[in-house]
């Protein structure tokens, strides 16, 4: 007879936290400096005028203005921020 009791154990039960990637501000929306526009893996969306690119490829606004998306290539888009005064 066994003297040790069988102990059930699961090798599953781990999960990574979500990365919350995607478009955060859409075309035409008003943004302030530092506003995150896109969180992404790699440069699926390219940075244009008046935006910065973080080391994790996050695109953020550098000025006050409106978000503008344009086609960059067949598979990529480009995002820029147009100054609010220039729009009016």
Curated annotation (Swiss-Prot):
Keywords: Ribonucleoprotein, Ribosomal protein. Residues 1-22 are annotated as: Disordered. The keyword Ribonucleoprotein applies. InterPro entries: Ribosomal_bL27 (IPR001684). Gene3D superfamilies: 2.40.50.100. GO terms for biological process: translation. GO terms for cellular component: cytosolic large ribosomal subunit. GO terms for molecular function: structural constituent of ribosome. It comes from the Bacteria. Pfam families: Ribosomal_L27 (PF01016). The keyword Ribonucleoprotein applies. Belongs to the bacterial ribosomal protein bL27 family. PANTHER family: LARGE RIBOSOMAL SUBUNIT PROTEIN BL27M, RIBOSOMAL PROTEIN L27. This is Large ribosomal subunit protein bL27. It comes from Herpetosiphon aurantiacus (strain ATCC 23779 / DSM 785 / 114-95). The gene is rpmA.
